[in-house]
């Protein structure tokens, strides 16, 4: 049989005995105490930081319940105990009573409340009711009166509004008419500015014009000085500004003078709108060919030796000043060619215009002996620039009749006439036909650009034959237009 635990054991010579339970309890208590209450660090020593110490203390934590050996109470017991403890004791002497709810009043009390407390109160209530009803009746009577007044006022207001609207409409119509007239005037001014490119001087004047071109360019920048004659139109004054804008878009061809007929200005307007950047056709000039001015400027740039000559006479058009500005900008892009003499016929000028559209690369026809000498020098350089920008050609000489000067004045007075619509339609048709023919001819010329430059004489002959037929028709139409405008 096993020896009971607490039984004394004899080891023979060793009479000392220690009960097992006491030894085990001691050792366990010591270990537990050391774990729970570690020794405080001594003041003089520093503890090394070991990795084990750096970690959290992983020693087991013992709950008080485990130490006691007690088990947890069941949940239902715990909850019930907690509830009872929260509630105050039922047997407390001073118990707090809940405030009693007011009982609803009985039927007898309600009847007594319904009865009036005194006859005075009744009378005062009746008086109030009467005053309220009277006030309501007065208000109700006043409302229809106001409505009737408002109705009477409304038709009056409507009539006034209608009158004001009619007046405003009339004012608007008059304003629109005046605006239309203003717009017409502005459009006319714009068209004159765009269309009226000034003529160019003949080569015989080129020597004096070299100095004049420089002087004009400086003068026009500061302010236009009174050199124009009384016959100059206001359109010419705007030409200087517009010519600067047009010089940016593309090279414009022959320009009109102030003395040109309005019909020719209309042609220039349409050409500006349709082409905008394309080459503009040759127009009649009053005194100069602009091409020679370009030559004069080139000579000035090359030599810078020419002396500045006498100022222009009072009859010089201000357009020539604008031409000087244009020449400054155009001289950068390319030189202008093809100058015609004062004795050239209008048929040859029409030929020059058509040749310009057909080839834009081919040789220029019917030049004067002086203009040929100047043109041939720059041909090699200019031919490259012609393809891109288009050569400037065909300018009429100063042999225009004074009758055209009178026509220009009449045309300016009749700018706003609506009868020009028919003439514009005819001109637009002619231009469309001309464009179709030109486009076909340009395609042919583009295929043979070298031949056109190398054989200018052959192309000139062919062009002359084709142009001779077309010139007769165009001249007849222009004369008809001029006659129609003179009749106005």
From Swiss-Prot:
Disulphide linkage map: none
GO molecular function: structural constituent of cytoskeleton
Pfam families: Cylicin_N
Domain of life: Eukaryota
Alphabetical UniProt keywords: Cytoplasm, Cytoskeleton, Developmental protein, Differentiation, Repeat, Spermatogenesis
Region (8 X approximate tandem repeats): 189-407
InterPro entries named among the record's database cross-references: CYLC, Cylicin_N
Gene Ontology biological-process annotations: cell differentiation; spermatogenesis
Subcellular location: Cytoplasm, Cytoskeleton, Perinuclear theca, Calyx; Cytoplasm, Cytoskeleton, Perinuclear theca
Tissue specificity as recorded in UniProt: Testis.
One cellular component (GO) term of this entry: cytoskeletal calyx
PANTHER family: CYCLICIN (PTHR16742), CYLICIN-2 (PTHR16742:SF2)
Protein name: Cylicin-2
Source species of the chain: Bos taurus
Taxonomic lineage from the root: Eukaryota, Metazoa, Chordata, Craniata, Vertebrata
């Amino acid at each position: 049989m096993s020896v009971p635990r607490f039984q004394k054991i004899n080891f023979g010579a060793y009479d000392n005995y220690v009960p097992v339970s006491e030894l085990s309890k001691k050792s366990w208590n010591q270990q537990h105490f050391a774990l729970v209450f570690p020794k405080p660090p001594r003041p003089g020593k520093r503890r090394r930081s070991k990795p084990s110490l750096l970690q959290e203390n992983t020693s087991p934590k013992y709950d008080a319940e485990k130490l006691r050996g007690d088990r947890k109470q069941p949940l239902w017991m715990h909850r019930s105990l907690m509830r009872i403890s929260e509630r105050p004791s039922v047997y407390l002497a001073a118990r707090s009573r809940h405030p009693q709810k007011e009982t609803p009043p009985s039927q007898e009390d309600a009847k007594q409340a319904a009865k009036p407390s005194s006859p005075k109160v009744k009378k005062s209530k009746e008086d109030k009711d009467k005053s309220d009803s009277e006030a309501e009746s007065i208000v109700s009577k006043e409302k229809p009166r106001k409505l009737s007044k408002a109705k009477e006022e409304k038709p009056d207001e409507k009539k006034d509004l209608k009158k004001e609207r009619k007046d405003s409409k009339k004012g608007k119509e008059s304003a629109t008419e005046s605006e239309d007239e203003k717009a017409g005037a502005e459009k006319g001014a714009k068209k004159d500015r765009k269309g009226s490119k000034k003529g160019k001087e003949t080569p015989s004047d080129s020597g004096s014009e070299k100095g004049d071109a420089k002087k004009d360019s400086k003068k026009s920048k500061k302010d236009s000085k009174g050199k124009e004659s009384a016959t100059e139109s206001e359109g010419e004054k705007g030409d200087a500004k517009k010519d600067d804008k047009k010089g940016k878009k593309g090279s414009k061809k022959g320009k009109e003078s102030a003395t040109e007929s309005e019909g020719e200005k209309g042609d220039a307007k349409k050409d500006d709108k349709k082409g905008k950047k394309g080459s503009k056709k040759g127009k009649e000039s009053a005194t100069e060919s602009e091409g020679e001015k370009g030559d004069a400027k080139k000579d000035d740039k090359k030599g810078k030796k020419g002396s500045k000559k006498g100022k222009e006479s009072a009859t010089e058009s201000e357009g020539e000043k604008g031409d000087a500005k244009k020449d400054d900008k155009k001289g950068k892009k390319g030189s202008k060619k093809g100058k015609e003499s004062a004795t050239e016929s209008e048929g040859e000028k029409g030929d020059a215009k058509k040749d310009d559209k057909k080839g834009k690369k081919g040789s220029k026809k019917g030049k004067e002996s002086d203009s040929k000498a100047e043109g041939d020098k720059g041909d090699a350089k200019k031919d490259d620039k012609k393809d891109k920008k288009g050569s400037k050609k065909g300018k009429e000489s100063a042999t225009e009749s004074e009758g055209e000067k009178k026509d220009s004045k009449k045309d300016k007075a009749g700018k706003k006439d609506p009868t020009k619509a028919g003439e514009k339609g005819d001109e637009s048709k002619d231009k469309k036909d001309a464009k179709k023919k030109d486009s076909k001819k340009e395609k042919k010329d583009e295929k043979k650009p070298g031949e056109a430059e190398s054989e200018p004489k052959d192309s000139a002959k062919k062009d002359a034959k084709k142009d001779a037929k077309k010139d007769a028709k165009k001249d007849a139409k222009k004369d008809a237009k001029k006659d129609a405008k003179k009749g106005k």
